[in-house]
Structure formats: C-alpha cells, structure tokens
Amino acid sequence: MLTIKANLRIYHKKGATRRLRKQNKCPAVIYNRGQEPSIPIILNQNDILHPEAVIQLYKNNVILLFIENQQPITVKVQELQYHPFKSKLIHIDFTRV
C-alpha cells in the first residue's frame, strides 16, 4: 500500500493553485461519500512522481494519505490530470474508500 503525506489546502482559487504548482506542489481533492464535504489537499510532486508511486497510482490501488493532525485516510485515485507537455501532475482527484 502506498503512503503519501499531504497538507490541507486553505486557498482554492486559480492564482493560489498556480503558486502551488510553481513550488513543486500538486493540488488534490478527496471526495467523500454522501453528504460530507470534499477535502482540498496539497501533495508534493516528488512524492507522487516517484517511480513506485506512479505505478501504484495507475494500478488504482488503495492509497493511505496522512494529512496533518488527522487520522490517515484510505483513498483510491479517481482522476489524474497531467500537464500537456511537462512531466508534472496538474491535479488529482481521490475518492474515499
């Protein structure tokens, strides 16, 4: 099982996500089942683009996210969005398992 560290994302607008990407971070969202609100998070590009991590992301395996000051969350990848010509992720959507 792949484990990734994440931080909560406070700012959600376009300019804030651009600044994150320039800092080698990747914005992501964890979608919950039912009425619970989604959780916006920030991931480090180096943690995600590690060769072992890429394989786990594409296999659609269960991933354990450690978010600061919270219980670990088990998720699956719903969607990956890559930059058109750079080898960077633009955004990831997770679904809680």
Swiss-Prot record:
Pfam entry (one): Ribosomal_L25p
GO biological process terms on file: translation
Gene Ontology CC: one annotated term: ribonucleoprotein complex
Gene3D superfamilies linked: Ribosomal Protein L25, Chain P (2.40.240.10)
Top-level taxon of origin: Bacteria
Gene Ontology molecular function terms on file: 5S rRNA binding; structural constituent of ribosome
Keywords for this protein: Ribonucleoprotein, Ribosomal protein, RNA-binding, rRNA-binding
Cited function: This is one of the proteins that binds to the 5S RNA in the ribosome where it forms part of the central protuberance.
Subunit and interaction comment: Part of the 50S ribosomal subunit; part of the 5S rRNA/L5/L18/L25 subcomplex. Contacts the 5S rRNA. Binds to the 5S rRNA independently of L5 and L18.
UniProt similarity note: Belongs to the bacterial ribosomal protein bL25 family.
Entry protein name: Large ribosomal subunit protein bL25
Organism listed in the record: Blochmanniella pennsylvanica (strain BPEN)
